[in-house]
């Protein structure tokens, strides 16, 4: 693969933007970076790079989560973490076998409905959380090892369970550090780390040092849910475009169909964002209380 200066700048800026979102939400690095990156670079090349970056980043995020929040969520995380191992093993093996275009289709098709669910503010708590965690863990391990994406399903699960903000970040960090470490080991055994991996890693890792603290600072100034909704809105647009390109190149769909699909995704995306902002403005609207005025006789 020929690595150009333009590609390095592109990956550095992409990493900065994605780590900014990750710092604010506690997840989202891969969800934002991978759909954009695989438009210009194959999964087999970029996946190992992002796995290394996320192994480092998730370690930092776990440290920032705080011991009290980690302790409060540890038992709830275990049923998800343990099944990640077989999922990662299968996914890492499939990465060497599946054609890049099919991987792109799998990434975008799996990601888009999850993004829309988050953008819609979907909530329906699961009573048997531990039992639900087992298939979720296996699915996350499979998805992450093939695509390095797992933030949306993890975030959807924990937010659906009504976790408080700090406990939510701690739970997400624990799952993500487990999957990234296990995937690193699996990739190393399969020989997926190359000289190109480490060259691109140095370019993508440095912007994270700025992006994470910046995201944490910004989210402390605005509502975390508002930040999350705008991030998901952008993500839906990117994923919709990526899926339209897969329709063109993999399924030989017409340009009219492919770009009409992208337009539909954007329309749904904007409608969900508008609904959220409208509902939020109503809740923030000051209530006028009429105070009776005593009349002089």
Q: What are the functions of these language-model segments?
A:
Residues 44-119:
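Membrane helix-loop-helix hairpins that form the core translocation module of multi-pass transporters
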Residues 65-79, 95-105, 126-129, 193-199, ...:
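Interfacial helix-loop-helix linkers and transmembrane-helix boundary segments
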Residues 7-76, 137-139, 144, 151-212, ...:
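Small-residue-rich hydrophobic segments that form or flank transmembrane alpha-helices
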